[in-house]
């Protein structure tokens, strides 16, 4: 009598126990599959949003915080940097492209991002309706923003101060929706894009008490950060060092910070995979999880 015959007789002699064992096994395998698939989707989304960005320059602080705020829009930025300093970097011979980013307001929790048309082009953004902004206080909505807020081309809305819901509204400087972007499965879907001048107009008008204050604010304009693409691969070695040592800004490499972030996100999934390999006694050679360590 072989093992299959014994298993068959056992299952028929104790059907409830057999069903429960199969159910537990199915739940375990299903949970493991869900964890691995979710991790893979998160990793793909993170890698897609960082594509085309060699370095992010912003205020000194945590490099990971700068990447989370400037690339993924999941954190608060360390601070602002002077526009004059950014323009000096734009003229640097190792900089092929510099995209300014200004944050500070939101609508229904979705961030309003002041930038240039090069930013949506970075992710291959296209319009589902309307047109790109042509003047200050015109805004283009991401697909998720339009779906959640119900705003359409021609509608007006006021930005709320801060990067989360609950700030005071800039009711005297409303935005006009000029376009709605098509879904791109990128960070663009959950952003409101406008000209960088719009962010300056809103906050300078809100802060200035007279013409002298307004002129002073305009002379000392700032942005939140800059996304930079190198003109040569060699810049990856020298440019961040130059920014970190010779300026009051910091340069953070998205590729390096992304690897750190993925290591943190992988901790739970790796534990589940290693437990499964150990539980079922599968050899390490059968493990497709690239952890670099034995699974048992």
Predicted regions and their residues:
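A hydrophobic alpha-helix feature that marks transmembrane segments and, especially
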Residues: 32-36, 269-296
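Juxtamembrane alpha-helical signal-transduction segment immediately C-terminal to a transmembrane helix
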Residues: 38, 42, 46, 264, ...
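Hydrophobic secondary-structure segments that place a key small or acidic residue at a functional site
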Residues: 106-117, 125-210
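Loop-to-transmembrane-helix entry motif
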Residues: 14-18, 26, 49, 258-261, ...
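Hydrophobic, regular-secondary-structure patches
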Residues: 32-111, 121, 135, 239-241, ...
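N-terminal Sec/SRP start-transfer signal
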Residues: 1-33, 263
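Mechanotransmission and gating elements of multispan inner-membrane complexes involved in transport
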Residues: 169-174, 180-269
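Feature of multi-pass inner-membrane transport and sensor proteins
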Residues: 1-13, 47, 54, 197, ...
């Amino acid at each position: 009598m072989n093992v299959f015959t014994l298993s068959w007789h056992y299952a028929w002699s104790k059907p409830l126990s057999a069903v429960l064992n199969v159910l537990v096994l199915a739940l375990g395998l299903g949970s493991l599959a869900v964890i691995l698939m979710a991790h893979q989707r998160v990793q793909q989304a993170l890698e897609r949003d960082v594509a085309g960005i060699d370095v992010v320059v912003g205020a000194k602080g945590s490099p990971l915080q700068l990447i989370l705020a400037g690339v993924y829009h999941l954190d608060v930025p360390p601070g602002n940097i002077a526009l004059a300093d950014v323009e000096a970097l734009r003229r640097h011979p190792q900089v092929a492209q510099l995209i300014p980013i200004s944050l500070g307001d939101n609508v229904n929790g979705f961030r309003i991002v002041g930038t240039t048309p090069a930013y949506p082009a970075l992710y291959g953004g296209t319009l589902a309706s309307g047109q790109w902004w042509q003047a200050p206080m015109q805004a283009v909505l991401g697909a998720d923003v339009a779906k959640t807020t119900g705003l359409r081309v021609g509608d007006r809305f006021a930005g709320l101060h801060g990067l989360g819901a609950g700030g005071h509204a800039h009711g005297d400087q409303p935005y006009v929706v000029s376009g709605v972007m098509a879904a791109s499965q990128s960070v663009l879907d959950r952003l409101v894009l406008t000209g960088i001048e719009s962010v300056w107009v809103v906050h300078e008008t809100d802060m200035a008490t007279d013409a002298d204050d307004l002129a002073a604010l305009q002379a000392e304009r700032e942005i939140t950060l800059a996304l930079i693409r190198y003109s040569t691969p060699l810049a990856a070695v020298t440019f961040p060092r130059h920014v970190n040592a010779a300026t009051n800004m910091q340069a953070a490499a998205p590729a390096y910070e992304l690897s750190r972030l993925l290591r943190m996100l992988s901790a739970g999934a790796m534990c589940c995979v290693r437990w499964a390999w150990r539980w079922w006694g599968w050899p390490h050679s059968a493990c497709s999880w690239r952890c670099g360590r034995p699974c048992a």
